[in-house]
Amino acid sequence: MSLTRRRFLQTSLPLAAAPLLAAKPSRTIGVQLYTVRGTLMKDSDHILKTIAAIGYKEIEGAGRSDLIALIPKINDLGMKVISCHVETPLITGDWEKYKNLKPVPLEEAIESLKKAGLAYFTMAYIQPQARGGDLDFYRMTADRMNHAAELCHKAGLQFAYHNHAFEFAGKEGERPIDIFHDRLDKKLVALEMDVFWVSVAGNDPIEMLKKWKGRVGLLHLKDKAKDAPVQYSESVPPAEFKEVGSGVLDFPAILKAAPAAGVKHYFVEQDQTSGDPLDSLKKSFDYLQTV
């Protein structure tokens, strides 16, 4: 063997083997600020600095006015605000069922997030007192989401809907989540899929990612305790919420399936934790760096 050929093989073989040592996917992890709702506005400097120091790069707000006030601080820390959970009656129009909220025109709310530089306008939840008793309510709600999504699209925002567990409860042989799947405009409405609530309702997050292929723009990450019962209420005992990687959900498989579903942004949201929410966020972030 010539010296030249020997050198070629010595240098090329490690390169040929490199694909076998595939790098972990590049994945930017964010925080849903609902996790730190109890102290955020009282000590925002400390909380946001800690979130940034942990390594989080993206933020999702849990309310428009508070988030907009915090955006300069968030930007100064090198993080980017991507999405915000907005007032449900902006979309549904039933302000009388939300006594603690001041009515605001939908167009005004859209403009506020557009002006603030966000990409997503996200409907987070339909409170129990506002849910109709039959499936026609969900058909009507889907139509109203489509309308809001059209206005968002014209303004340069993406409309999204965040699921919980109640959408998976069967009624009249059909489920609200199936109505949303079939009735929401595929081009205008993205799903913000919460893997915890999908699983709490007895469904497989991976199968749901496949069913909603190309339509899941955002993913909420939190883990579930072993032996947690199937239920369709959000009244879940705090102990059933676990940090990512500390429960029974198959996060390596979920994260592998996410890109094909259309996921662009990943947010850790810890609704309940027995300790310091910031410690909880660090635990989840550290685990996510390993998968």
Predicted segments, located by residue:
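Boundary/entry segment of secreted carbohydrate-active catalytic domains
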Residues: K24-K42
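Active-site beta-loop-alpha junctions enriched in small/polar residues
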Residues: Y34-V36, A62-R64, V86-P89, I126-P128, ...
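Hydrophobic faces of well-ordered beta-strands that scaffold small-molecule active sites
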Residues: R27-Q32, I59-G61, V81-V86, F121-M123, ...
